[in-house]
Amino acid sequence: MNFKTVISLFLVLFVSFVYCENGAELLFHKKIVEGPVVGKELPIQFIIYNVGSEPAYDISFIDNDFSNAEFEFVSGSSEGKWETLAPNSQVQTNLTVIPKKSGIYSLTSTVLNYRKTQTSSEFTVSSAASYSGMYVESQADYEKRTSLLIKEWITFFVLCAGAIALPYSISTYYKKNYENGIKK
C-alpha cells in the first residue's frame, strides 16, 4: 500500500470514532412465538435490547394490534414502561391473546419512545421489527395440516406390501419348483 492510502484510511477511522454518537441505542422486536390458530392461545413477546454504551431512560411503548374485538385477551400487557435500561441488557414483556376468527390481519409497527440521556428533553422514536401481516388459521385447517394422516399411512403400507409380496411369492414359487421339480 502506498503512503496516501494508509493516511486516508487512518483519517477515515479517526473521523468515524470522533463523530460516533455515544448514548443509548435501542432495538425493539415484536415476536409472534407460535403460528396463530383460531381458539388457541397466541403468545407475543415484545423485546427491547440496549446495544448502546449508555443507559436509556423513560422507555415506553403501546401496541394496539391485538386490542380489537377479533382477539380475546388472556394475560400479559400490550404496553410497557421502564425508567432505565442498562447498556448491553434487555427487557421483555409478554402478551397472550386468543384469535376468535380466521383471516388475514394487518400488523402495524409498534412505536417505542425513549430518551438517550437523562437530561435530554427530546424523545427518540423507534419502530419494532415486526411482521406486516398475520394469517390466522382456522381450527379445521390446522388439524388437517398437523394430523397424523392415519388413512394415508395405512394405504401406503398396503401398497408397499403388495409391491413386495407379489415378486417374493413368484420368486419363492420358481425356487421351489427348481429345487423339487414340478409335481405331476
Curated annotation (Swiss-Prot):
Sites where a glycan is attached: N94
Gene: ssr2
GO CC terms of this entry: endoplasmic reticulum membrane; phagocytic vesicle
Signal peptide, first to last residue: 1-20
UniProt membrane topology term: Single-pass type I membrane protein
Transmembrane segments: 148-168
UniProt key word Protease: no
Phylogenetic lineage: Eukaryota, Amoebozoa, Evosea, Eumycetozoa, Dictyostelia
Function: TRAP proteins are part of a complex whose function is to bind calcium to the ER membrane and thereby regulate the retention of ER resident proteins.
Family membership noted in the UniProt record: Belongs to the TRAP-beta family.
Keyword Transmembrane appears in the UniProt entry: yes
Keyword annotations: Endoplasmic reticulum, Glycoprotein, Membrane, Signal, Transmembrane, Transmembrane helix
Protein name: Translocon-associated protein subunit beta
Subcellular localization(s) per the UniProt record: Endoplasmic reticulum membrane
Lumenal side: 21-147
PANTHER family tied to this protein: TRANSLOCON-ASSOCIATED PROTEIN SUBUNIT BETA (PTHR12861:SF3), TRANSLOCON-ASSOCIATED PROTEIN, BETA SUBUNIT PRECURSOR TRAP-BETA SIGNAL SEQUENCE RECEPTOR BETA SUBUNIT (PTHR12861)
Pfam families recorded: TRAP_beta
InterPro entries reported for this sequence: TRAP_beta
Tree of life domain: Eukaryota
Main location: endoplasmic reticulum
The protein's assembly and partners: Heterotrimer of TRAP-alpha, TRAP-beta and TRAP-gamma.
Residue ranges annotated as Cytoplasmic topological domain: 169-184
